[in-house]
């Protein structure tokens, strides 16, 4: 029963069931990433490191990735993500570590990190678009997503 659960649960969590009967070379590349993630979920490590997980993903893939991360976090697993996609980072993580030239140059809450322009530039990343717009129009409040930006004008 435990073996069956450890096999079936990752398949359902990652949303790959429709692709199980396909030849591996016929599976779309973005879905192949989820096959790999399913194996990781089955092994159930304490820490999961995802390197640029949103690269090549469409909206479904990004939403599915969020479900997988929620599942892992609910199981008490630590999820570490390496990403240049700051929209994704702002939406999914509370703590951000910024690295440049093999060194940690900033570490803290996203509300603080995304307003450190010099540190982000040093790491060759930009804050989320909503944060950039808020800064350009002079909104003093920390804005991290478009809904927060829209709410400033209601």
List each model region and its residues.
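ABC ATPase nucleotide-binding domains
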Residues: 120-154
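ABC ATPase "signature
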Residues: 107-108
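Conserved ABC ATPase "signature" C-loop
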Residues: 101-102
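Conserved ABC ATPase "signature" region
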Residues: 2-19
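Catalytic Walker B motif of ABC-type/P-loop ATPase nucleotide-binding domains
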Residues: 48-51
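A short, surface-exposed alpha-helical micro-motif characterized by mixed small hydrophobic
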Residues: 89-91
């Amino acid at each position: 029963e435990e073996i069956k659960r450890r096999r079936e649960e990752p398949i359902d969590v990652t949303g790959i069931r429709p692709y199980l009967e396909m030849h591996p070379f016929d599976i779309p590349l973005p879905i192949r990433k989820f096959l790999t993630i399913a194996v990781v979920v089955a092994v159930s490590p304490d820490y999961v490191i995802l390197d640029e997980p949103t690269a090549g993903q469409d909206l479904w893939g990004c939403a599915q990735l969020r479900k997988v991360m929620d599942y892992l976090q609910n199981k008490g697993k630590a999820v570490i993500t390496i990403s240049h996609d700051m929209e994704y980072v702002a939406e999914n993580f509370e703590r951000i570590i910024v690295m440049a030239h093999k060194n940690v140059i900033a570490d803290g809450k996203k509300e603080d990190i995304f307003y450190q322009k010099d540190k982000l530039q040093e790491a060759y990343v930009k804050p989320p678009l909503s944060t950039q717009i808020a800064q350009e129009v002079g909104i003093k409040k920390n804005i991290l997503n478009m809904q927060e930006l829209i709410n400033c004008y209601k």
